[in-house]
Amino acid sequence: MRPGRLRLLVGLGNPGSKYVGTRHNIGFMALDKLAGQKSVSFRPQTKFHGLMAEVGVGSERVRLLMPQTYMNESGRAIRAAIDWFGLEVDQLLVLVDDMDLPLGRLRLRAQGSAGGHNGLRSAIQHLGTQDFCRLRIGIGAPGCTSEERRARTVSHVLGVFSRQESLLVDQVLDEVLIGLDLIQCLGLERAGNRLNAFQPEGCSAC
């Protein structure tokens, strides 16, 4: 993604109060933090199956979208917004949780597979390509073995962060916002050099 190319920023998560603050909703949390920083509000947009806010004006405008379709159907909302605004897929960035990354780590990529994530799988299906940018936000994995991980995946991603974890999440989301500015100013590669090396203070497991 070239500097200034980003036009649609999508955070993945599940709608409803029961999912607020859960690990699976860290994409929503990032957009909420950005909206607060920019003093903008999300409004329901039925044609996009989600909540939308806008930052910037004119040719610098970026839409923020939180699909309200539940995670497994996130791609419907993304496709609807891409089509409505006449955007190209390379103007899209998706913010998504990732169990394969420790809590506190970030991975910015220009493309890639779903990696077992249902929201990304839906996006790839509806867009017809996996060549879109995504920022994976680590939430860590439960258990020490593959069997434990499989048994505890649902409770882990739908669970809320502990108080200690929330301190790390605050640092991570601050870094995400810095990274989004860098993507617009410097492009994906240079922003990735910083984001992919990020390590929050006080995180020995990172």
Swiss-Prot record:
GO terms for biological process: protein quality control for misfolded or incompletely synthesized proteins; rescue of stalled ribosome. Its EC number is 3.1.1.29. It is found in: Cytoplasm. It catalyses: an N-acyl-L-alpha-aminoacyl-tRNA + H2O = an N-acyl-L-amino acid + a tRNA + H(+). Monomer. NCBIfam families: pth (TIGR00447). Belongs to the PTH family. This is Peptidyl-tRNA hydrolase.
